[in-house]
Amino acid sequence: MKKNTDSEMDQRLGYKFLVPDPKAGVFYRPLHFQYVSYSNFILHRLHGILTVKRPLLSFKNNTERIMIEISNVKVTPPDYSPIIASIKGKSYDALATFTVNIFKEVMAKEGISITKISSYEGKDSHLIKIPLLIGYGNKNPLDTAKYLVPNVIGGVFINKQSVEKVGINLVEKITTWPKFRVVKPNSFTFSFSSVSPPNILPTRYRHYKISLDISQLEASNISSTKTFITVNIVLLSQYLSRVSLGFIRRSLSYDMPPEVVYLVNAIIDSAKRLTESITDFNIDTYINDLVEAEHVKQKSQLTINEFKYEMLHNFLPHMNYTPDQLKGFYMISLLRKFLYCIYYTSRYPDRDSMVCHRILTYGKYFETLAHDELENYIGNIRNDIMNNHKNRGTYAVNIHVLTTPGLNHAFSSLLSGKFKKSDGSYRTHPHYSWMQNISIPRSVGFYPDQVKISKMFSVRKYHPSQYLYFCSSDVPERGPQVGLVSQLSVLSSITNILTSEYLDLEKKICEYIRSYYKDDISYFETGFPITIENALVASLNPNMICDFVTDFRRRKRMGFFGNLEVGITLVRDHMNEIRINIGAGRLVRPFLVVDNGELMMDVCPELESRLDDMTFSDIQKEFPHVIEMVDIEQFTFSNVCESVQKFRMMSKDERKQYDLCDFPAEFRDGYVASSLVGINHNSGPRAILGCAQAKQAISCLSSDIRNKIDNGIHLMYPERPIVISKALETSKIAANCFGQHVTIALMSYKGINQEDGIIIKKQFIQRGGLDIVTAKKHQVEIPLENFNNKERDRSNAYSKLESNGLVRLNAFLESGDAMARNISSRTLEDDFARDNQISFDVSEKYTDMYKSRVERVQVELTDKVKVRVLTMKERRPILGDKFTTRTSQKGTVAYIADETELPYDENGITPDVIINSTSIFSRKTISMLIEVILTAAYSAKPYNNKGENRPVCFPSSNETSIDTYMQFAKQCYEHLNPKLTEKELSDKIFCEKILYDPETDKPYASKVFFGPIYYLRLRHLTQDKATVRCRGKKTKLIRQANEGRKRGGGIKFGEMERDCLIAHGAANTITEVLKDSEEDYQDVYICENCGDIAAQIKSINTCLRCSKLNLSPLLTKIDTTHVSKVFLTQMNARGVKVKLDFERRPPSFYKPLDKVDLKPSFLK
């Protein structure tokens, strides 16, 4: 639609990132990071986790040890790559086996003697079975343990076995920045976690807390429950770093505001007073005394030297092999941040900032579970050895303990949405839209309990750190997660790195840092600490920081370190730190590089001419300084210009202040938001509502729906959208389709299409317009004896079953039909009965309102009979079904009109859908009109000048003016018919047509907006929601219809329904519905003295209140509703007295009788 010019180079570069890049192994960009994460776990990480050699038990001062060794770990993946298998949708199933050896080591003078205790060589191919990434279910179609109808080649597929079901990427609870917290006025804490590097297994975790109370500065301590002593933070830093208190004072005070310097002096002085209060103070003796006290307190079995070594050696596991002196300098840098944060809290990354968090991808889920289950497995072996030694006096292990690692059960729980035992459940995949196959694996969310604790986590605010990396439009509009920003933007991805790559990268970076002059990287007193994954490695001369960071970034882009996703962050603002991040789980995305005030894209003249023939990896190799992969921490502490256009309008001095420049606005949306059109031309809420509706659109889910026993709704005749964005095309959402093109007219139709009502053409429905097929899984578990029982009295519910007790293939199920035989029987304890066996049907019935055809039946025979039935039903649009455009103009079918009832144009064409025209103005969806105009222009000229079919690019967010799109439409029509007059051309551009009244055949006075648009059918279907019924079950308490369609529920008749009938004056109807039916009628006796409801004691009605006072009141019988009685009883139980009083008045239908005077007449 638009020519590629120099001003659009940024857009073309952004598109290059989205398309596949086979040279770099990227075949599908949206989920590439998930594929790599999963592949790394199977091919590399699992082997390292399972390879273990460690002591289980030790005796006699560690001279005798029971050892466990897991070796010969063999992971058997298929012949093809996990990534290729994922894209092709093939079943990826990796199997792992290993050998366990348990032996006893005895240390003697002659040496170490080894005695074998037990051994298990895992030859079972299913010892550890890693589930599928993408692909469904049963590999063996002729499995004898399963009964299958029809038993065709291809088997039956159960979606539950796919990792695709897992759901969102969880944010790790451990933060990479310490968490600052105000406990109370003038009292603060600084909590941080230390996790060992990925090459150290099992992973060691330590959590520390620094406390500071202004009123008790001597108690400024660092502590960790059971893993470290409680000690003054300044003295600990001095002990580790071996420097004076003056050195620490100068280090903390350097480049700090005056108020922070004052607090630094106070803390150092308090530490000095603490040392002076102890006679002959020695820092080593002081720490040793604290360690000994902690040893006694914990009642440790270790010797004091072993205990001290264990505590101090494991202090700060992330700096495991680092000298104590660097650990001390690291503690000083932490204390520096802490003191600064007290005064300038808003400038420090808070706990909600994505800067502080790493993200768990699919491979990381499996890795975490493998760690946990391996520890459980080893723990079970240890306990079994101890129990056998205690009971039998021998070191032995039961074989069933060795053969059940427990990983398979943990992986199975993960696929059900359960991640770890302590973390609760989280949402898994629904199956309504193909778009959700992409959107959910790219969603980032907090743990469920973190979402609920709103006091701790303000996750419902659009945090500044989420800008550009997350989609601001695709957020829930209602429910418990309303406003939760979770969807990644199209350019964002999550880093993955192998352990070997991690160690090599760390080594290269350290070598580069140490290539600087020794004195320049040893400024530990007043320099900028350099950390790699929070581990301190050097401290840089403050005069060299800018040159160091600039040179590091240039070398990174040129591939000097062998990894283009390294993050380097220069933290200024008095915190003074250079942070280098290389680990997995970081959010990264590309940015355009600005170097010394120049946009590097502009200084590469060859780039534009060669760009069409290059992939993204080619650009990174041949033009390394044009684009840089930046993680979210580096972005937060960098100066980023929001657009190339804005950057070019700045002066040269202003440009030099920037480090990076962003891509156009369309790349800030997620893939769901990219399916919308022109959201920046509409009102803001339309984007949020549009994303929600797009995910509810019914699409073409799978080409193998007949073999996949799973719920799903599938569009029968999908069409590829004409108006699309590049992200929609590269993600294959457009190719998989999620709607159809229909002809709409914006007008009023006999007052029927008010509000959200739409008119739909009957012939359009009959031709298969927006027709769908519903696939539904019905699953029942039946006890084996019930399944084998025979029915004594023939039941209509079993009319669709075959002699084997299963529903017949191709049978049409109606409401009330059983899907499998389930007959329960009992024996009566009656010696005189001829037949003391009674049986009754307890089968689960088909409950849907519509008939469905049985497509497939599967049975698993174990201790219970598991029956799975797949039913299919074609469902055409009916009254009440929901539809929408891609601009959130939803509509509900209000009337299905015959073609003869609809207006027509000069060619006799009638609209498929009529939409209320006022909805455009009230919802401000201008882009809906633009979409119609562009789709109509495409129909006039569907090919470009080279004769190739081309869709129209109308991105979700764009800076293109509406006039540009109008000019494009004008050129299309002029190309088709150059002789059009200005008026005719204007009508065609703006899709205005004269329509004729079908009743009078006369033209309407005004022109009507009439044209094609991409229309979506939503999964909100009338027959799935309708619960209205005249008769049926009611609840015992309130005598209203029970809830739930599966239980035959109905709609409750509540206050609003009552008010409607009152407004219509239908008093008798209210009486009939709420009172006169036999279920609701209730006789109640009321005490006329106190107004209480009488109680029934031994069939005698008595007023309890009056009987205690020895009164004999009059009880009056009234008829009321059962609900009224329940209401009064519940109010009384809550201490609220409701008195029923009787009104004293004469009958309303008779006048008072005339008085009769009985006096004798002579007395009158």
UniProtKB/Swiss-Prot annotation:
InterPro entries: DNA-dir_RNA_pol_su2, DNA-dir_RNAP_su2_dom, DNA-dir_RNAP_su2_hyb_sf, RNA_pol_132_poxvirus, RNA_pol_bsu_CS, RNA_pol_Rpb2_3, RNA_pol_Rpb2_5, RNA_pol_Rpb2_7
Keywords tagged on the record: DNA-directed RNA polymerase, Metal-binding, Nucleotidyltransferase, Phosphoprotein, Transcription, Transferase, Virion
GO CC annotation, single: virion component
A biological process from GO: DNA-templated transcription
Paired cysteines (S-S): none
Domain of life: Viruses
Gene3D superfamilies assigned to the protein according to its UniProt record, in alphabetical order: 2.40.50.150, 3.90.1100.10, DNA-directed RNA polymerase, subunit 2, domain 6 (2.40.270.10), RNA polymerase alpha subunit dimerisation domain (3.90.1800.10)
Catalysed conversion reaction: RNA(n) + a ribonucleoside 5'-triphosphate = RNA(n+1) + diphosphate
PROSITE patterns tied to this protein: RNA_POL_BETA (PS01166)
Assembly information from the UniProt record: The DNA-dependent RNA polymerase used for intermediate and late genes expression consists of eight subunits 147 kDa, 133 kDa, 35 kDa, 30 kDa, 22 kDa, 19 kDa, 18 kDa and 7 kDa totalling more than 500 kDa in mass. The same holoenzyme, with the addition of the transcription-specificity factor RAP94, is used for early gene expression.
Family designation: Belongs to the RNA polymerase beta chain family.
Protein name according to UniProt: DNA-directed RNA polymerase 133 kDa polypeptide
Organism: Variola virus (isolate Human/India/Ind3/1967)
